[in-house]
Amino acid sequence: MAIVSAEKFVQAARENGYAVGGFNTNNLEWTQAILRAAEAKQAPVLIQTSMGAAKYMGGYKVCQSLITNLVESMGITVPVAIHLDHGHYEDALECIEVGYTSIMFDGSHLPVEENLAKTAEVVKIAHAKGVSVEAEVGTIGGEEDGIIGKGELAPIEDAKAMVETGIDFLAAGIGNIHGPYPENWEGLALDHLEKLTAAVPGFPIVLHGGSGIPDDQIKEAIRLGVAKVNVNTESQIAFSNATREFARNYEANEAEYDGKKLFDPRKFLAPGMKAVQGAVEERIDVFGSANKA
């Protein structure tokens, strides 16, 4: 299947009691790993770029072209959306212009009324081009690419107002954070999520900071209405651990590769990319989106 907008497969997840993964990419190899995992599991997927990752990779146009061409060259058959994660207003508009099929406008740092007004503007522009829109109420805790939030519970009335702007799925604070979870983290506020989904019945909720949340809490959140789960830190840790292990065992690895010098970056990066693919496949299984393409 070609590159698609995300609203239909996210809504299908909401209606059928599973969640799709929004997996952040950082380069060519990560993109390949995510696509291989999605294809192996026959799962719809959003490949996401943060503003920082897109800058690192050469800009939004480069990211869009890279993902689009890899989907074609790798023969990917599952639905793939190209998604902007936590984008400012100008970034959201640029992504719509260069061919992203899904965007998140994050105006959660703005006063509520301004957030709602700007989101409505983004929705109008995006939907005119067939691009799905995610927006946020209630700051997601932690830090990601310089965006820092204390973490809070999204006000129910704000969530209802945000849904009325015409967005396709809603990121809402329910005690979740970006990055590794501290030992004293109290867990997801599932009771608040239940109230939230009751206020916007049938509407897809997005769980940010999906890395490190216990699987039982993720599954319960999905049962209550979460239809998209974002994953980044988990993939980064998997990549880092595998690469460090490879470097520690350099001589043994060199023998395994028939004595070839391992300064070739393709060999050096391979274990980390395999680990990312494995991490993505494992999350797809937990989210229940395998064989839902």
From Swiss-Prot:
<dbReference type="InterPro" id="IPR050246">
    <property type="entry name" value="Class_II_FBP_aldolase"/>
</dbReference>
<feature type="binding site">
    <location>
        <begin position="209"/>
        <end position="211"/>
    </location>
    <ligand>
        <name>dihydroxyacetone phosphate</name>
    </ligand>
</feature>
<comment type="similarity">
    <text>Belongs to the class II fructose-bisphosphate aldolase family.</text>
</comment>
<dbReference type="InterPro" id="IPR000771">
    <property type="entry name" value="FBA_II"/>
</dbReference>
<dbReference type="GO" id="GO:0030388">
    <property type="term" value="P:fructose 1,6-bisphosphate metabolic process"/>
</dbReference>
<protein>
    <recommendedName>
        <fullName>Fructose-bisphosphate aldolase</fullName>
        <ecNumber>4.1.2.13</ecNumber>
    </recommendedName>
</protein>
<feature type="binding site">
    <location>
        <position position="208"/>
    </location>
    <ligand>
        <name>Zn(2+) 1</name>
    </ligand>
</feature>
<keyword id="KW-0862">Zinc</keyword>
<dbReference type="GO" id="GO:0008270">
    <property type="term" value="F:zinc ion binding"/>
</dbReference>
<feature type="binding site">
    <location>
        <position position="178"/>
    </location>
    <ligand>
        <name>Zn(2+) 1</name>
    </ligand>
</feature>
<dbReference type="InterPro" id="IPR013785">
    <property type="entry name" value="Aldolase_TIM"/>
</dbReference>
<dbReference type="InterPro" id="IPR011289">
    <property type="entry name" value="Fruc_bis_ald_class-2"/>
</dbReference>
<feature type="binding site">
    <location>
        <begin position="230"/>
        <end position="233"/>
    </location>
    <ligand>
        <name>dihydroxyacetone phosphate</name>
    </ligand>
</feature>
<dbReference type="GO" id="GO:0004332">
    <property type="term" value="F:fructose-bisphosphate aldolase activity"/>
</dbReference>
<feature type="active site" description="Proton donor">
    <location>
        <position position="85"/>
    </location>
</feature>
<comment type="function">
    <text>Catalyzes the aldol condensation of dihydroxyacetone phosphate (DHAP or glycerone-phosphate) with glyceraldehyde 3-phosphate (G3P) to form fructose 1,6-bisphosphate (FBP) in gluconeogenesis and the reverse reaction in glycolysis.</text>
</comment>
<dbReference type="Pfam" id="PF01116">
    <property type="entry name" value="F_bP_aldolase"/>
</dbReference>
<keyword id="KW-0324">Glycolysis</keyword>
<comment type="pathway">
    <text>Carbohydrate degradation; glycolysis; D-glyceraldehyde 3-phosphate and glycerone phosphate from D-glucose: step 4/4.</text>
</comment>
<feature type="binding site">
    <location>
        <position position="86"/>
    </location>
    <ligand>
        <name>Zn(2+) 1</name>
    </ligand>
</feature>
<feature type="binding site">
    <location>
        <position position="136"/>
    </location>
    <ligand>
        <name>Zn(2+) 2</name>
    </ligand>
</feature>
<feature type="binding site">
    <location>
        <position position="179"/>
    </location>
    <ligand>
        <name>dihydroxyacetone phosphate</name>
    </ligand>
</feature>
<feature type="binding site">
    <location>
        <position position="106"/>
    </location>
    <ligand>
        <name>Zn(2+) 2</name>
    </ligand>
</feature>
<feature type="binding site">
    <location>
        <position position="50"/>
    </location>
    <ligand>
        <name>D-glyceraldehyde 3-phosphate</name>
    </ligand>
</feature>
<keyword id="KW-0479">Metal-binding</keyword>
<keyword id="KW-0456">Lyase</keyword>
<dbReference type="GO" id="GO:0006096">
    <property type="term" value="P:glycolytic process"/>
</dbReference>
